[in-house]
C-alpha cells in the first residue's frame, strides 16, 4: 500500500516480482503504473489500451503522471533529448489509442540524489514537507510549454527556498545540515537548464500536429537514500577547467 493505493492482486504473484504494468486501487481512483524499462513490450501496451478503452469507452484515462528520475536529467544533452523523444513516442501511442490529448503532469522523483536538497526540509514538520513543490500550468488548447512561464515558475520556486531559508536554519542545529540548507537553492537552480531541455524537447509542437498537453512539473522524494550528485561542486570545478 502506498499513499492510500493498494496494488491489485499483487500478493497472488509474490511481492518480489517487478511487473511492467501494475494497477493501484484506492477508494476514489485507479492508477495504472507502466514501466518504461526493458521488461516493457509494445504488445503489453496495445492490450492495455484496448482493455481500458473497452472498460471506459468515453474516456479511457483522465491523464498521465510522468515520473522521471532526476538522475536521468544529469546525463549529457544527447541522452536527455533521446529520452524525451522515446517518451513522446510512447505518449502519442496512448493519445492515438484513446482519441484524446491526455493532460501530462511531470513528476521529478528521487530529488534526494541532488546534494543538499532534502536537507533543506529537514527541520520542517510533516505537513510542511507534504506540501506540493512545483507548478501547475494553465490549459493550452494546442499543448506545449511556454518558455516564459517555465522561467517564471522555476525562479519562483528558487525564491521560495530562499525566503524560507531563515526558518529552515532556525530549526536545524546540525552544522552540516545548516551548510546544506544554505546551498540548496543553488543546487536546485543548477537543475533548471537540463529540466528545460527535457521538457522543451518533450512538448515541442510539430508542423502538422499539436504538441503534447503539458500541465505541470513537480518535485518529490520517496525517502530512500541513494548516491548524491553535487551540482554546485561540479559547476565550480568545471569553471576552474576541470572536467
Where are these regions (language model features)?
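Basic, amphipathic N-terminal segments
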Residues: 1-243
Amino acid at each position: 500500500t502506498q499513499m492510500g493505493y493498494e496494488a491489485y492482486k499483487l500478493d497472488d504473484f509474490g511481492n518480489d516480482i517487478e511487473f511492467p504494468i501494475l494497477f493501484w486501487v484506492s477508494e476514489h481512483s485507479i492508477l495504472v503504473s507502466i514501466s518504461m524499462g526493458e521488461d516493457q513490450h509494445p504488445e503489453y501496451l496495445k492490450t492495455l489500451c484496448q482493455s481500458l478503452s473497452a472498460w471506459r469507452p468515453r474516456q479511457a484515462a483522465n491523464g498521465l503522471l510522468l515520473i522521471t528520475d532526476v538522475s536521468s536529467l544529469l546525463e549529457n544533452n544527447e541522452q536527455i533529448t533521446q529520452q524525451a523523444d522515446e517518451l513522446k513516442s510512447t505518449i502519442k501511442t496512448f493519445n492515438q489509442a484513446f482519441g484524446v490529448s491526455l493532460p501530462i503532469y511531470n513528476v521529478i522523483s528521487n530529488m534526494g540524489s541532488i546534494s543538499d536538497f532534502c536537507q533543506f526540509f529537514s527541520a520542517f514538520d510533516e505537513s510542511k514537507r507534504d506540501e506540493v513543490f512545483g507548478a501547475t500550468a494553465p490549459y493550452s488548447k494546442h499543448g506545449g510549454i511556454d518558455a516564459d512561464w517555465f522561467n517564471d515558475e522555476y525562479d519562483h520556486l528558487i525564491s521560495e527556498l530562499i525566503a524560507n531559508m531563515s526558518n529552515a536554519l532556525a530549526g536545524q542545529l546540525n552544522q552540516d545540515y545548516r551548510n546544506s540548507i544554505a546551498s540548496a537553492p543553488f543546487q536546485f537552480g543548477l537543475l533548471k537548464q537540463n529540466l528545460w531541455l527535457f521538457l522543451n524537447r518533450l512538448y515541442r509542437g510539430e508542423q502538422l500536429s499539436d504538441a503534447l498537453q503539458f500541465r505541470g512539473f513537480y518535485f518529490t522524494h520517496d525517502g530512500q537514500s541513494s548516491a548524491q550528485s553535487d551540482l554546485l561542486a561540479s559547476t565550480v570545478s568545471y569553471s576552474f577547467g576541470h572536467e
